[in-house]
Amino acid sequence: MDTILAGGSGTSDASDNTCTICMSTVSDLGKTMPCLHDFCFVCIRAWTSTSVQCPLCRCPVQSILHKIVSDTSYKEYEVHPSDDDGFSEPSFEDSIDILPGDVIDLLPPSPGPSRESIQQPTSRSSREPIQSPNPGPLQSSAREPTAESPSDSQQDSIQPPTRDSSPGVTKTCSTASFLRKVFFKDQPAVRSATPVVYGSIESAQQPRTGGQDYRDRPVSVGINQDPRTMDRLPFRATDRGTEGNARFPCYMQPLLGWLDDQLAELYQPEIVEPTKMLILNYIGIYGRDEAGLKTSLRCLLHDSTGPFVTNMLFLLDRCTDPTRLTMQTWTWKDTAIQLITGPIVRPETTSTGETSRGDERDTRLVNTPQKVRLFSVLPGIKPGSARGAKRRLFHTGRDVKRCLTIDLTSESDSACKGSKTRKVASPQGESNTPSTSGSTSGSLKHLTKKSSAGKAGKGIPNKMKKS
């Protein structure tokens, strides 16, 4: 084999080859044994997880050679065809409900019909030994759990502590590899995505609240739920000891890298990590629901919510695309996404720092600080005082230019019902005339009549006098 490796394409020739699985340049060369065909290691490892035949010659693959440095320095990844028997057998139902107190027997598959090996649930006291009423060839009365002489088959079974009020249930599955993949957290790249299944060893260590409430939430385990193709988004990490993004699957790293860079543009460094964990929690709740994500994130992102959610869902689709799970490493910078510039500013704030209401009557007068600088201030009132929005009305004649300032601020709580008190101030020192009219047009008409009557004969146009 040393001679074959020396004569074959080593790491120096990996850049000249093309992987027939991902149709890209070979990255991290992997050679199949015994046919010695070249592929990307991640591609051929994902291929052999579903089929043990070589993609080129269709011969059975026994192992995969990778990390080839020299003829004597390499690593070998063994392929076990028996690990996938549980997913190919038609013996299981669509789902298996696992409740607290269930005992899962991890025995080899029986030679007979596998449907008969699944025992019906039987109610027994939790203090009695759990066994089948009619012991078969795979389950006999000699397998009773005893403290004096524990057997080897006892170590393969998962027996969590049960309560007196909960019945014991025995379920025997025909394939041990299927249940090992469901319960044990040793799958590559999805360690933090494994849910806590009630009835396993890990669930016995989890705190339970609400008495028997957890019994109302059985966990359904599907047959074709391959750990490499997740149906849900694994963002609720449980590995608290792992720092940074290492607790999440490797195929989610482009999305996590974009979140780090984007949130660093919008927020202060000390709140980037808590904000990222909150956003990932919302993704775990809403998934790809764009409306739900926008509603939940609007309090954090304000006007930047729309483009932020659009970019996030775009990267989420690329990360979870099954055709990209076996491709080479990529980052969000390889896409056309551009970062949103920050910082985040709360919208619709007045010059005094008070957030305006959502009422259309207020927002059409004061929306931005640029419009506030165009308003005039009443004589004797300090600039910046909370007296509401001011609007100028210009009436131009041949030699007169009058400026009326109208204060539309409510002086009582009755402003919410639509009744507002309006005051009129004249630059020539005329007395203020309060008007309680319900419509703005009526108040303006009244003010126009008063001003035209006071300035009669001073060059005011005839059109204004008639009005």
Swiss-Prot record:
UniProt organism field: Varicella-zoster virus (strain Dumas) (HHV-3)
Name the Pfam families on file: zf-C3HC4
PANTHER family in the record? E3 UBIQUITIN-PROTEIN LIGASE TOPORS (PTHR46077), TOP1 BINDING ARGININE_SERINE RICH PROTEIN, E3 UBIQUITIN LIGASE (PTHR46077:SF1)
Principal EC category: transferase
Q: For bias kind Low complexity, which ranges apply?
A: 149-161, 429-443, 450-459
Provide this UniProt record's keywords sorted from A to Z: DNA-binding, Host-virus interaction, Metal-binding, Modulation of host ubiquitin pathway by viral E3 ligase, Modulation of host ubiquitin pathway by virus, Repressor, Transcription, Transcription regulation, Transferase, Ubl conjugation, Ubl conjugation pathway, Zinc, Zinc-finger
ZnF (RING-type) ranges: 19-58
Cite the GO molecular-function annotations of the record.
DNA binding; ubiquitin protein ligase activity; zinc ion binding
Protein name from the UniProt record: E3 ubiquitin-protein ligase IE61
The UniProt record describes its induction as: Immediate early (EI) protein.
Enzyme Commission number, as recorded:
2.3.2.27
State the source organism's domain of life: Viruses
GO annotation, biological process: protein monoubiquitination; protein polyubiquitination; symbiont-mediated perturbation of host ubiquitin-like protein modification
| Bridged cysteine pairs (disulfide) | none
Enumerate the SMART domains for this protein: RING
Q: List all Basic and acidic residues biased stretches.
A: 228-238
Chain intervals with Polar residues compositional bias: 116-143, 162-171
